Amino acid sequence: MSKVLSTLRYSAEHEWVDAASPTKVGISQIAADALGDVVYVDMPEVGAELTAGEPCGEVESTKSVSEIFSPVTGKVVEVNQEPVDNPAVLNEDPYGTGWLFTVEVSEEGPLLSAEEYASSNGGDVE
């Protein structure tokens, strides 16, 4: 089973949120495993205004293209270049070096605890 980190919160669309300030966002290992080999990542630019639940980028794999939905409302303050340069990092380390961007949050969207997310999606909480 895919790993779900207990220290993070999750959106129903498979993004994770680390609530430190600024808030770090990524995709879950469950999402990365379902996508297969990731070959391309498109993310919002620094300064972009995001709305919780709205698309803000996409991840392309050898199997499909999936949108990235912002789990929070706010302004992008940093984009991680690593997944752009090496998209496979989303498969290898989605909770570490594979984080996507950080946001100065003005409002959170509906988020699930690790236990709720794992229960709904078949992951193991660690």
Regions found by a protein language model. Give the residues of each.
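Acidic, low-complexity mobile loops and tails
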Residues: 1-55, 88, 92-126
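Residue-level recognition of beta-strand microenvironments
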Residues: 17, 62, 79-82
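ATP/adenylate-binding site constellation spanning eukaryotic-like Ser/Thr protein kinases
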Residues: 22, 70-73
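Short, Lys/Arg- and Gly-enriched loop/turn segments at beta-strand edges
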Residues: 60-69, 86-89
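Charged, alpha-helix-enriched surfaces in structured cytosolic catalytic cores
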Residues: 71, 85, 112
